[in-house]
């Protein structure tokens, strides 16, 4: 892993609940329309989703530690292994239905399916990069991207890709500064209306 002024390490099972909380906090404006009145279930659902990604989705997570190992200040997920997409989808649906009920689960599953991504064997896929609000602008996001790219190289990936919403200008500037370039776009009337996301940009970088 690259050297940084703070500790970047691979996440452990004990970190999954904290990662889930970070993700919900970091994307709160996107999760509210998805979970609605069941927002109180969002962290529990996300924790189980992160666990499913780790066990079935070929995803590894990296975290930035605070002063104590249990204190997580930032996190990122990177898909570098093989994913059992069928089992992953069934697992997520079971979690959603159990915690939200059938109708809300169907709605949540539809919105959570965006942006669409098809795995490529030679490419790593980065997701859910989040930094706690009070620790932003300290280089943690760059450090996590650097570590994720390094891990991807260890798994012989040739490129790394990620999605970002067209209105997330700080993230776009960060990725462009790191050498990511736009490869394609997805337009969704559904996410445009309900999440305020008109387009999803797919960015790639050669490793």
Where are these regions (language model features)?
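Glycine-rich phosphate/pyrophosphate-binding loop shared by adenosine-nucleotide-utilizing enzymes
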Residues: 4-6, 69-75, 124
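A short beta-loop-alpha structural element at the N-terminal edge
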Residues: 7-21, 32, 81
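Conserved GNAT-fold acetyl-CoA-binding loop/helix
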Residues: 27-49, 85, 97-99
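Active-site rim helix/loop that mediates acceptor-substrate recognition in acyltransferases
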Residues: 38-61, 66-67, 72, 77
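Conserved acyl-donor/pantetheine-binding loop and adjacent beta-alpha core of acyl/acetyltransferases
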Residues: 82-124, 191
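Conserved GNAT acetyl-CoA-binding A-motif
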Residues: 123-124, 152-163
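Conserved acetyl-CoA-binding loop-helix of GNAT-fold acetyltransferases
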Residues: 131, 137-150, 173-177
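C-terminal "cap" of GNAT-fold acetyltransferases
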Residues: 158-161, 165-172, 177-178, 188-207
